Amino acid sequence: MLDVNFFDELRIGLATAEDIRQWSYGEVKKPETINYRTLKPEKDGLFCEKIFGPTRDWECYCGKYKRVRFKGIICERCGVEVTRAKVRRERMGHIELAAPVTHIWYFKGVPSRLGYLLDLAPKDLEKIIYFAAYVITSVDEEMRHNELSTLEAEMAVERKAVEDQRDGELEARAQKLEADLAELEAEGAKADARRKVRDGGEREMRQIRDRAQRELDRLEDIWSTFTKLAPKQLIVDENLYRELVDRYGEYFTGAMGAESIQKLIENFDIDAEAESLRDVIRNGKGQKKLRALKRLKVVAAFQQSGNSPMGMVLDAVPVIPPELRPMVQLDGGRFATSDLNDLYRRVINRNNRLKRLIDLGAPEIIVNNEKRMLQESVDALFDNGRRGRPVTGPGNRPLKSLSDLLKGKQGRFRQNLLGKRVDYSGRSVIVVGPQLKLHQCGLPKLMALELFKPFVMKRLVDLNHAQNIKSAKRMVERQRPQVWDVLEEVIAEHPVLLNRAPTLHRLGIQAFEPMLVEGKAIQLHPLVCEAFNADFDGDQMAVHLPLSAEAQAEARILMLSSNNILSPASGRPLAMPRLDMVTGLYYLTTEVPGDTGEYQPASGDHPETGVYSSPAEAIMAADRGVLSVRAKIKVRLTQLRPPVEIEAELFGHSGWQPGDAWMAETTLGRVMFNELLPLGYPFVNKQMHKKVQAAIINDLAERYPMIVVAQTVDKLKDAGFYWATRSGVTVSMADVLVPPRKKEILDHYEERADKVEKQFQRGALNHDERNEALVEIWKEATDEVGQALREHYPDDNPIITIVDSGATGNFTQTRTLAGMKGLVTNPKGEFIPRPVKSSFREGLTVLEYFINTHGARKGLADTALRTADSGYLTRRLVDVSQDVIVREHDCQTERGIVVELAERAPDGTLIRDPYIETSAYARTLGTDAVDEAGNVIVERGQDLGDPEIDALLAAGITQVKVRSVLTCATSTGVCATCYGRSMATGKLVDIGEAVGIVAAQSIGEPGTQLTMRTFHQGGVGEDITGGLPRVQELFEARVPRGKAPIADVTGRVRLEDGERFYKITIVPDDGGEEVVYDKISKRQRLRVFKHEDGSERVLSDGDHVEVGQQLMEGSADPHEVLRVQGPREVQIHLVREVQEVYRAQGVSIHDKHIEVIVRQMLRRVTIIDSGSTEFLPGSLIDRAEFEAENRRVVAEGGEPAAGRPVLMGITKASLATDSWLSAASFQETTRVLTDAAINCRSDKLNGLKENVIIGKLIPAGTGINRYRNIAVQPTEEARAAAYTIPSYEDQYYSPDFGAATGAAVPLDDYGYSDYR
């Protein structure tokens, strides 16, 4: 077998009949499979041992040779080679066809490659191949030309003969008629009888004329067809063809079926054809030129690849190895077999019958029919159902052909090559493990024992608990006591991987150190649930065991959960306290006025109370019960750093040192909370709402090493659970309080609603206005009930505590429980003007319940659809970006993009940009950031973290130029500096990081949270697409629904207002041609934007617009933005539009992820004029390749090619990738492979997918070339030492090792039998 690590490209091409015969180990002559009595393969059949190898190791068919020592011998009785049975997985056979057949992929694909090559319409091609028409394969022009006059004379003679015969017959008939009439007249017959005779005579004469005319027409037809006869001409009329062959057989050859196609291809001159097509393209116009372009693609493919087009017509069909189309015996003596065997059987049967018919010399019509059936059976074998009705098996199920084995989710690519099942894995239900550290998980004992079995067995033998592996295995199976001790030892420091399906982003698989636990459930740390999206309502997780040292190192260093605290999408921590923990910390840090032991200042004769000399003293007081943790106290602190303001005031420039004392007015709870934070973190003296907790952890992640952050969140988790228990927050029916003012509020609004209803009945309002008014009224009512509810609830109400702390839920839910449900939507997404006035606490009426179900059901249906759609989007994103890998440190480009940091308010203050988190944060600065005085605040090449951004804002800088992947100059992949900081580590991205896949996951993972619906904006008007469909529309570069025109030029607007349409004309400032936008529907409203005078209003007559400005409401078409404003603008447009959808759902994704995808969409250039290059006009070329080729051509003094950037949707971009393996495993497998084979494509194996498919290490991380191809150089001392070793003769090593390949030596290939 090939070792995958020793080749670095993979080529696909057309196999000729010669290739097929060379691969083959013998011809399959019989359709038999196995003998049903002996169950041994039949000789020369589809499972024949002579061809494919023995069915049992080292045993021939007849049993003469058994044992390894006969290795390689071919038995003289049965002809079977003595070898391993596994050769039946790799040895191929073939079927010699009695007549050639065409390959259905090349004939039936769209476009038909055979049709383009031979310039035949697919319909005609089908007629020829399936024996419905003859085709002329060659004409002897010269001979025909030389003898034309002779032939014409012969033809004239023949026609003369026909005419003479006709005239003679007419003459005779006329005379007979005369005689008959004369006779009748003599007899004195009536006029009636005479007329009948005359009519009869004339009818016969007409028939004679017609017959002669038909004969003449036929001769004319034959002659004209013959004189115009040319190769590739179709003749559908069988009789005409027969006549031509009889008369002029020596001047031309013609045939039917694949043989004729084969002849045409043989006579086909590729170079001449390519030249003439190029000529047409240079000088032609319109349809002709287009057709020539399409044909040239196919012709040039054959010309450049050196493929022989003969490969499209097969003389022999390969038979794949039998183990890949097995036959298994079921219980009950029946057999189950692969569909391929059926398809092969049909081919062999028909082929054998055809051979017999040809040998018998059967009539042509029978032979042709058999050839047609053979062609159809080969078609079914290659791609069943591509043409006509598919061949069906039992139960009318279409049989799976060779193409179906590759296609789709169940095909070879996606089922076996890209996703495999692995051993050393298990799965179980998860339960919470609050006692675990962040990097630990609880593994059930039994599962651990099974997973680590080989390790345990080896260790048992090492420790002499067992004599050999076999007895060790027995000990493990019987679970002896020693086994558990050994298991503890083996499991230590050996991380395991936990995975929860669906794995939407890379944090869906993380490594943990296992702790053995009783029971059968896996225990999971509560803080990693967010990343896995896990909860404990019955979720299951899978465990995998990394075996090799490298795998363990990777798991420990890169995948350990404590190293994955930050989200790769936004760079913000994911391991945050949630739910109970938030409640506990919120409770702990609340200050309750007037609680036990509160600080009282000195008054009169009372000294001050509630003052403590240290936290320890306060804790003693709390333990005695004289102080509550939530009471305000004064305490002297020495180990906690004071807040920044206090530190500056008390300790001045020198700053606080551990041990310096200061007094804090706070609560004991807050002191306890601050003791959880790392030493030297400023004291936080406020109530810990979830947002505050998040901000603190965020800050820790920016300033402290990951390990500190991990320890801190663990401490917070423990304290959170402890105090959540102590707080006694529970929910009961008694906690849901209905506000007493609810009835009067609703009565008041009911009156207002009645007024509107009356106006409607009087006709003062139309239906829509009434609905809008009612919706407004009831929205106000709902809000007011909410207000009343809030005032009515006491602060210590548990429901309010849970909502206020940010643990879970929101106020709307509280309002629904205790206030009123409010307005609900109908299935169309519009508000129903009758509100639900009851709360869930009171219970709904039947009508309210009914209208409430609409929304609930729609929600569930949406969720199901969304999951599938979102998964498919992620798959396409991964596919388009999988080869974007960080390839170098810095591409040295000067380009970048400008991002806003802040906006200057009219009063001169800076308003921080709300999206700074996803735009400027974590980027590399492209130019020095300079303030107004000219001081450099942040230098070029600096990473912009939170401190740097704060410094820039403090210096009054509003925008900076940053490096971006959109402007990166690296040819394949991107460079680290343009990408900037890796969101997941908080440091500059490593070389070898697969940033494309991270980007795809970051965009796809929140996809399930996006909405499915298209919003109705304000009732009427075009629907604005939103949510997931909008993201797909953008990434697929489709023309959006409700497309808005954009200004092609800068100028003044003339707006003409028609009855149903607007007409907008722009008069350019530079005096160019006016641009007219006609028939713009009024349903699309005019766009509101800022005008030169600073006002915001609708576009109106006489306004001045900038180039690229949107004129109507709706979405601009990205292709137009590209045409009008160029690639830069369309990139920014796409990033902005995608972000808008995610921001609407409150999802934070960094711009750089979207930029990676957008970069892939704009990678290609379409060739307009090929100049002196080899590019074909209209083809899509990678920009880097285009520029390189142009440089080369210009250097040689040629004419460069002209191209135009194109925006491709992600599906199209994935299929247009240079890697045919990656494209084939994505979609349209047969089309991609057909194309790749014709072009003799090479896959350079640059991306990830290709390497996964062939089983190489992926070129990312340490698999990238600069890490893989490291040569170790010995030091001088080592060199000197090397020469002191006595040299051995080479032959010691040569027989077994030779030039080492670096591959492991498979021991079972060495026959040890000789030494026994």
Swiss-Prot record:
Gene Ontology cellular component annotations, sorted alphabetically: cytosol; DNA-directed RNA polymerase complex; peptidoglycan-based cell wall; plasma membrane
Gene3D superfamilies in the record: 1.10.132.30, 1.10.150.390, 1.10.1790.20, 1.10.40.90, 2.40.40.20, 2.40.50.100, RNA polymerase II, clamp domain, RNA polymerase Rpb1, domain 3
Binding positions for Zn(2+) 2 per the UniProt entry: 891, 968, 975, 978
Residues noted as binding Mg(2+) in the record, renumbered to the chain: 535, 537, 539
Class of enzymatic activity (EC top level): transferase
UniProt entry keywords in alphabetical sequence: DNA-directed RNA polymerase, Magnesium, Metal-binding, Nucleotidyltransferase, Transcription, Transferase, Zinc
Annotated cofactor note: Binds 1 Mg(2+) ion per subunit. Binds 2 Zn(2+) ions per subunit.
Protein EC: 2.7.7.6
Gene induction: 6-fold repressed by starvation.
Reaction catalyzed: RNA(n) + a ribonucleoside 5'-triphosphate = RNA(n+1) + diphosphate
GO molecular function: DNA binding; DNA-directed RNA polymerase activity; magnesium ion binding; zinc ion binding
InterPro entries per the UniProt record, alphabetical: DNA-dir_RpoC_beta_prime, DNA-dir_RpoC_beta_prime_bact, RNA_pol_asu, RNA_pol_N, RNA_pol_Rpb1_1, RNA_pol_Rpb1_3, RNA_pol_Rpb1_3_sf, RNA_pol_Rpb1_4
Cofactor or coenzyme needed: Mg(2+); Zn(2+)
Gene Ontology terms: biological process: DNA-templated transcription
Residues the record lists as binding Zn(2+) 1: 60, 62, 75, 78
Oligomer and partners: The RNAP catalytic core consists of 2 alpha, 1 beta, 1 beta' and 1 omega subunit. When a sigma factor is associated with the core the holoenzyme is formed, which can initiate transcription.
Family to which this protein belongs: Belongs to the RNA polymerase beta' chain family.
Protein function: DNA-dependent RNA polymerase catalyzes the transcription of DNA into RNA using the four ribonucleoside triphosphates as substrates.
PANTHER family: DNA-DIRECTED RNA POLYMERASE, DNA-DIRECTED RNA POLYMERASE SUBUNIT BETA
The name this protein goes by in its record: DNA-directed RNA polymerase subunit beta'
Naturally occurring in which organism (per UniProt): Mycobacterium tuberculosis (strain ATCC 25618 / H37Rv)
